[in-house]
Amino acid sequence: MARIAIVGSGVVGQATGKGFSQLGHEVIFGDVKDDVLVRLRAEGYSAIHVHHLPEYPASAIVLSLPTPTEHGRLQLKYLESALEVVADSIAASDDYKLVVVRCTVPPGTTEELIIPRLERASGKAVGRQFGVSHNPEFLRAVSSEQDFLEPWLMVFGSHDDRSGRELEELYSPILAGNHIPVVHTDLRTAEMAKYASNLYNAAKISFTNEIWSACRHLGIDGDEVMAIASQSAEGMWNPRYGTRGGFPYGGACLPKDTTAFLAFAAETGIHMPLLAAVIEVNERVAAGDVVPDYMAAAAGGGGGGGGGGGGGGG
């Protein structure tokens, strides 16, 4: 059993803390909002103002603070403010502590902001007196607590091997015998994977809405069209389809059908900016603006690089 401190007790923090508590860990919630603390205490959980967390002997500290946008730009002020408390907690103990970042942050934030701040303020070294891992959450707001206990994927981005092992051990009651895929990777990859997940979901919804809008313009049931496409389009049901970067889509159908339908839409008065962007990106990749490292290395060495885009009969 570990002693876990949650820094930031919103949706993610509460789902994480309550989940770890159900797994048998000793959990204390920290937040700056009194009403949040009162509700947690009423539910039977230990909850204190975040500034008192250094007094709690936690072996793991989970950062689950909001990273909102203001005027379209990400704000890290809540995270930065919390780092002072976390550093004090690290400095106050001779025991190894694991810092787990659950915030959604741009790639490089953990390495370039979080770790240097913690080392400087605590006077201790990452990888020795404390560890750092980025553990992106893929929780849905409406079912966050259930999603924590029943994950479809776990991603552990870690500064060093011990950090990764310690983090996996926290989740061991969930992972044992449940065949949940676990990805151990570096910090930047874990940070980017969270964004890629959210950006893909957003792009898929916008694609559906663009098709739905075109269907409505044409007097077609867009919901029925997307229900069919969800089963007929390989990209909908094959999770590996189109996930190898650096290759344009090709074949007999995709290039001609995308350009033909965009022209048809323009002639019919249908605005399809997402489809236009899809074609633009593909043209850039085909022109060599985006080349995978392994292809560039092969070309530099005189070898040939294999590859191909998604095609399909048509």
Predicted segments with their positions:
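NAD(P)+-binding Rossmann beta1-loop-alpha1 motif at the extreme N-terminus of oxidoreductases
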Residues: M1-Y56
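Rossmann-like NAD(P)(H) cofactor-binding subdomain of soluble oxidoreductases
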Residues: A60, P68-F138
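Internal alpha-helical scaffold of NAD(P)-dependent oxidoreductase catalytic cores
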Residues: R117-N135, R140-W237, F264-H271, A277
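NAD(P)-dependent Rossmann-like dehydrogenase/reductase catalytic/cofactor-binding core
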Residues: A2, I6, W212, R216-G314
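Structural motif
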Residues: V62-S64, V155
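Alpha-helix C-terminal capping/helix-to-coil transition sites in glycosyltransferase folds
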Residues: Y56-P57, P151
